[in-house]
């Protein structure tokens, strides 16, 4: 009987593990935010009508995780530094920023890292990585009138022009071409499909504050991200050699179309030209987002990056604010840490187009598999467990039927 009781306990345990019954599930309170953290739930009020949907109501704010992703200290919305560290630079106007180690994922210092803001063009990293992961770089793409008609910064994509995915990526990342973003979105399946893929990538990278409404970063209904999420996205991107090479490129020959000749495209990131060891990054601006910026640099083998959201050009330009934050990070001892940029979902590893440069996956990353991906695994475990338990029960019954000597 003791053996049978053990088998019963084993059966219950296997069933619980296989189905997920009894395991805690993530929950959040989308409307619970301390008064001191005004952007914990929603982005700042818009200054124009660009986010008003054509019909219906705007989407509800994203659910706030019950605990801050990356560590409890990152739940603060003031300036957060490690104990004993020097004060952060005082000339950074961005309302949210972050300094982190590109290789270890250690967050060195931050301000309101999970505060929700609009990304502007720094969100183009997701279009770039979705394209790098799924498209062939030398694939030819015909420009369209819709590409040329997009609002904002453009690099010259138009009817009569043919561009490779690689050329579009350079136009996207070096000079923030919104026309290049829309051309790549067409290659990802068209606007609805592209946005679905981009948002899925953001989710698999751990971005719980991010909803992408446009591939270019132009403001749209429900557009949202955080300095922490942007840090996740760019850490992932910089481990890809195609991305790293493009954002570090200063000039590139971009093709023309029709009677319009090709020209030399210049990288618009001033950090690349003015900061020793700069690895590049991305600029951004819209009326609602304000100034946004991402930059990274290598100093004596230590690679750091910084993210700035909802900033201004005062008292110094965003790239100089980023430079001061990078200086601050490099002046802190290696190992200084207030939180962590979590590892991406393991499923991203199988779609990496550069297997020699794949990221490390820690044990915690395996726990972040999505519910949809986890369901077949749980069902399989439950079936196998049931067969094992059935076999053990049959063995136990056979033992009980044996004659006693």
Swiss-Prot record:
Keyword Transmembrane helix attached: yes
Membrane topology per record: Single-pass membrane protein
Annotated transmembrane regions: 375-395
Enzymatic class: hydrolase
Functional summary from the UniProt entry: Probably cleaves the terminal D-Ala-D-Ala dipeptide of the peptidoglycan stem peptide. Shows weak D,D-carboxypeptidase activity in vitro. Acts on the synthetic penta-peptide substrate Penta-DAP (L-Ala-gamma-D-Gln-DAP-D-Ala-D-Ala). The catalytic domain binds weakly to peptidoglycan in vitro.
Record comment: activity regulation: Inhibited by the beta-lactam antibiotic meropenem.
Protein name: D-alanyl-D-alanine carboxypeptidase DacB1
Positions annotated as active site in the UniProt record: 121 (acyl-ester intermediate), 124 (proton acceptor), 176
Subcellular location: Cell membrane
Primary location class: membrane
One Pfam family named in its UniProt record: Peptidase_S11
Highest rank taxon of the organism: Bacteria
UniProt organism field: Mycobacterium tuberculosis (strain ATCC 25618 / H37Rv)
Modification(s) after translation: Phosphorylated on Thr-336 by PknH.
GO biological process: cell wall organization; peptidoglycan biosynthetic process; proteolysis; regulation of cell shape
Enzyme Commission identifier(s): 3.4.16.-
Pathway: Cell wall biogenesis; peptidoglycan biosynthesis
SUPFAM superfamilies: beta-lactamase/transpeptidase-like
Segment forming the signal sequence: 1-32
Family: Belongs to the peptidase S11 family.
PANTHER family per UniProt: D-ALANYL-D-ALANINE CARBOXYPEPTIDASE (PTHR21581), D-ALANYL-D-ALANINE CARBOXYPEPTIDASE DACB (PTHR21581:SF33)
Keywords: Carboxypeptidase, Cell membrane, Cell shape, Cell wall biogenesis/degradation, Hydrolase, Membrane, Peptidoglycan synthesis, Phosphoprotein, Protease, Signal, Transmembrane, Transmembrane helix
Molecular-function GO term, any one: serine-type D-Ala-D-Ala carboxypeptidase activity
């Amino acid at each position: 009987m003791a053996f049978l009781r053990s088998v019963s306990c084993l059966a219950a345990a296997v069933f619980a593990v296989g189905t997920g019954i009894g395991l805690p599930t993530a929950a959040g309170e989308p409307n619970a935010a301390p008064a001191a953290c005004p952007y914990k739930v929603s982005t700042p009020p818009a200054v124009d009508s660009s986010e008003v949907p054509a019909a219906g109501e705007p989407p509800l704010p994203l659910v706030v995780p019950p605990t801050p992703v990356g560590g409890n200290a990152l739940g603060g919305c003031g300036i957060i530094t490690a104990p004993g560290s020097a004060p952060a630079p005082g000339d950074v106007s961005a309302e949210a920023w972050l300094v982190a180690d590109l290789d270890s994922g250690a967050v060195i210092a931050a301000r309101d890292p999970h505060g929700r803001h609009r990304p502007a063009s720094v969100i183009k990293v997701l279009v770039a990585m979705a394209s790098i992961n799924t498209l062939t770089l030398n694939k030819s793409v015909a420009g369209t009138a819709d590409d040329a008609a997009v609002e904002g910064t453009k690099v010259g994509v138009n009817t009569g022009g043919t561009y490779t995915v690689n050329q579009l990526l350079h136009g996207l990342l070096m000079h923030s071409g919104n026309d290049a973003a829309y051309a790549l979105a067409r290659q990802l399946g068209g606007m609805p499909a592209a946005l679905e893929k981009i948002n899925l990538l953001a989710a698999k990278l751990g971005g719980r504050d991010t909803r992408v409404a446009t591939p270019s970063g132009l403001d749209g209904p429900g557009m949202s991200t955080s300095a922490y999420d942007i840090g996740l996205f760019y850490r992932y991107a910089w481990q890809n050699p195609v991305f790293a090479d493009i954002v570090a490129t200063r000039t590139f020959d971009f093709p023309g179309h029709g009677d319009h000749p090709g020209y030399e495209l210049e990288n618009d990131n001033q950090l690349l030209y003015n900061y020793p060891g700069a690895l590049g990054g991305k600029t951004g601006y819209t009326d609602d987002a304000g100034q946004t910026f991402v930059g990274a640099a290598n100093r004596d083998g230590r690679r750091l990056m910084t993210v700035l959201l909802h900033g201004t050009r005062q008292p110094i330009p965003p790239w100089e604010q980023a430079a001061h934050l990078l200086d601050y990070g490099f002046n802190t001892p290696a190992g200084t840490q207030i939180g962590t940029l979590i590892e991406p979902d393991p499923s991203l590893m199988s779609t990496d187009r550069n297997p020699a440069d794949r990221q490390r996956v820690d044990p915690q990353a395996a726990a972040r598999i999505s519910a949809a991906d986890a369901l077949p695994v749980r069902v399989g475990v439950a079936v196998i467990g049931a067969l094992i338990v059935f076999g053990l029960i049959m063995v136990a019954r056979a033992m009980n039927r044996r004659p006693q000597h």
